[in-house]
Amino acid sequence: MTDHNLLPEPKKILWRVSELNRNARVILEQTFPLLWVSGEISNLKRYPSGHWYFSLKDDSAQVRCVMFRHKNLYLDWIPQEGMQVEAQALVTLYEARGEFQLTVEQLRRAGLGALFEAFERLKARLQQEGLFSPEYKQPLPRFPRQIGIITSPNTAALRDVLTTLQLRLPSIPVVIYPAPVQGEGSAAAITTALHTAAVRGECDVLILCRGGGSIEDLWAFNEEIVARAIAACPIPIVTGIGHETDFTIADFVADARAPTPTGAAQLASPDRQAILHRLQYWLHRLQQTMERHIERRMQATDLLAHRLIHPGERIRHQQMHLLQLRGRLQNAWNRQVEIRTWRIEETGRRIHSAKPDIQAGIRHQQELAARLQRAMAHRLENLQFKLRQQQQHLIHLDPKAVLARGYSIAYTARGDILHDSRQTRAGDNVRLVFASGWAKADITETGE
């Protein structure tokens, strides 16, 4: 018979409370995935920190829950005591007290799960059909001639859109296609408004918008008939539905999506200030480009003018300059005539008011006209005289005039002009050009 008191006892593991709670928390979090739990809210407390503490219960049990501020901020509704909800949560243990609890990630009213499932099914089907594909998206016009708005009248969303359009570019006309955006029949009304806008074809872009709300409030924009009406519309559509965190089927099908109605108005309309700044920028660039182009042309013209040595070209330039001077002279003449005419009329008025000798005034007028005629004729004669001098000077510079005085030009066999006796040697052939005709010669001797 064995004496159990003599057997060695197994080694005992002694856990500290904190170690036990920590290991239990790890086991819970690793064992249970992120899951959905339904129940009734009770003992709801909202702390100044923004965190929410409550219990979820059913007929036979309850569990403690916490939803931290950075999670509950995204809710567009406020939970109330006794409300039936569905919570997506992580199963865990509050180590400090050893309390089993749920850390809630998302919270929705009971029954919305079916809506989310319907949303995901329709989204997947339309995506498979290609309604969300980028190649089907129409580009938004940069400068729309008219903008259409599809929303419910007398709403904050409509006021926000109209205010934004007025601030950005008040000259753009706006057409409102009224349609209820919430409740029974709203999806059909939105579809009708889209069809009306497409048939009338009076707008270059459409804004489909409404303010924030729950998933039920926004459900009209998740209906298939609305999605297909958007896809079939030949006019580009910008959606601005709810808040930044709200996404609807209409947002995925539309040509562009904005987080709010105000953002949709900004996407659909050009900014007047941005246009003005852009125009000023391009005007400045154009001015700089033109100035540089003119400067380059002026430099090229100066270079070409410097290289031109033919007297005929210089004569033509002088003739063009003379024509310019004639034009300026004619303009000056016209201005002087206008000035003299005004002075004569003014003198006539003075004569009429002072009752002087009319004949003396007429003689003064005739004298002024004669003096002006003589001055202009003298000026024109001087300009013509200078032109003749320039022409005569250029004629004297013509190489042919030098040849006419008995000189000749000698060319080598390659056609180069001979400037120096060292360019040739005895036995070379040269060509002599005279004022009239030419002759060949043989070099018999060279010297310096």
Curated annotation (Swiss-Prot):
Function: Bidirectionally degrades single-stranded DNA into large acid-insoluble oligonucleotides, which are then degraded further into small acid-soluble oligonucleotides.
A GO BP entry: DNA catabolic process
A Pfam family matched in the record: tRNA_anti_2
Native organism: Nitrosomonas europaea (strain ATCC 19718 / CIP 103999 / KCTC 2705 / NBRC 14298)
Protein name: Exodeoxyribonuclease 7 large subunit
Catalyzed reactions: Exonucleolytic cleavage in either 5'- to 3'- or 3'- to 5'-direction to yield nucleoside 5'-phosphates
Family statement drawn from the similarity comment of this UniProt entry: Belongs to the XseA family.
Domain of life: Bacteria
NCBIfam families: xseA
UniProt keywords, alphabetically: Cytoplasm, Exonuclease, Hydrolase, Nuclease
Broad class of enzyme this protein falls into: hydrolase
Subunit structure, interactors included: Heterooligomer composed of large and small subunits.
